[in-house]
Design a protein with these regions (language model features):
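Loop/turn-to-beta-strand initiation segments
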Residues: 2-5, 123-124
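H-loop/switch region of ABC-family ATPase nucleotide-binding domains
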Residues: 7-10
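RecA-like P-loop NTPase motor core
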Residues: 15-124, 129-135
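Short secondary-structure transition/capping segments
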Residues: 23-24, 51-60, 111-114, 142-154, ...
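Residue-level signal for secondary-structure boundary elements
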Residues: 88, 162, 166-169, 260, ...
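Short acidic-hydrophobic, aromatic-tinged amphipathic segments that line or gate anion-handling sites
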Residues: 98-103, 142-145, 231-232, 238-239
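Activity-critical C-terminal alpha-helical subdomain
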Residues: 123, 129-213
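Charge-biased C-terminal accessory regions appended to nucleic-acid-, cytoskeletal NTPase
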Residues: 173-271
Length: 271
């Protein structure tokens, strides 16, 4: 076999050689010594050729993340905080996700991300829907954990903890902040029961109740946001929910690997 050895500073040529798995050796000039780069890739080579740091390389590079609303972004932040504490590999990439501050319905987001003519645009972004929808990795869509709308997940979870007299209600942080069972009864459960009666009255009189439950849940969440934040932290750390929390992490990782190259972010940042 004929072997060819040559040197180059051409980024495009190096990128092509790496893509076809050619043997690329990159030597790093460290002033007083020269050593071979371990596992060279185009991102590390570009950084060294341009005398940049990792922070310089990724300063303006982010992956757009679209969610349905502010409530979803709030819970997504809590999930990210959990993943940073639990998975060291996630710590270096969490800041690369840019949560777009816009409210778009699940139906509209799904329509955008499944539109074949927009694929070139949407494949550069990640869509995160509430848990009452399904993930669609092919179209860059992932569903939040919980298998229901976030507010519904938390309301059901609060009721479950209340009925079970869970130790959550005796946790020092919860008690010190005043979020006792009495708080739950007065500010949340009574409101839920009252709204349920109101919905029944509307249905019996022939009035439409479409969307009313969702609107009520969102208002209740925002009126008691700090309580629900603590509740969701407990939900995330509950072993009963580990499969859902881990499923979301895995699917988010898969989408990161698909989307990162479009933003000149090395997939190796999240191995």
């Amino acid at each position: 076999k004929i072997q060819v050895v040559f040197t180059t500073h051409s980024i495009s040529l190096l990128e092509e050689m790496l893509s076809i798995k050619d043997n690329v050796i990159y030597l790093i000039d460290n002033v007083t010594s020269v050593f071979q780069m371990e596992e060279p890739d185009i991102y590390k080579i570009r950084m060294h050729l341009q005398s940049l740091t990792r922070d310089d390389i990724y300063e303006d590079k982010v992956i757009p993340v679209f969610t349905e609303d502010d409530e979803a972004r709030c819970l997504l932040d809590l999930l990210f905080n959990y993943y940073q504490r639990t998975y060291p590999a996630f710590r270096s990439v969490s800041s690369l996700f840019h949560k777009v501050l816009t409210n778009i319905s699940a139906e509209n987001l799904t329509g955008i991300f499944t539109d074949g003519k927009l694929l070139h645009t949407t494949m550069r972004s990640i869509c995160i829907l509430d848990g009452d929808h399904s993930s669609d990795i092919t179209n860059f869509i992932v569903a939040l954990p919980g298998k229901a709308a976030p507010e519904a997940v938390l309301l059901n979870y609060a009721e479950k903890l209340y009925d079970a007299d869970d130790s959550f209600w005796r946790d020092r942080t919860i008690v010190d902040k005043g979020y006792t069972k009495n708080y739950y009864l007065s500010n949340i459960k009574n409101e839920v029961d009252s709204f349920g009666t109101q919905l029944d009255r509307m249905r019996n009189s022939g009035e439409t109740s479409k969307g009313k439950r969702r609107e009520f849940n969102k208002r209740l969440f925002n009126d008691n946001r700090n309580f629900f934040i603590l509740l969701f932290k407990h939900w995330i750390n509950n072993p009963e929910n580990k499969s859902e929390v881990d499923r979301f992490y895995r699917e988010l990782h898969t989408l990161f690997l698909k989307v990162a190259p479009y933003h000149e972010i090395s997939p190796k940042e999240w191995p």
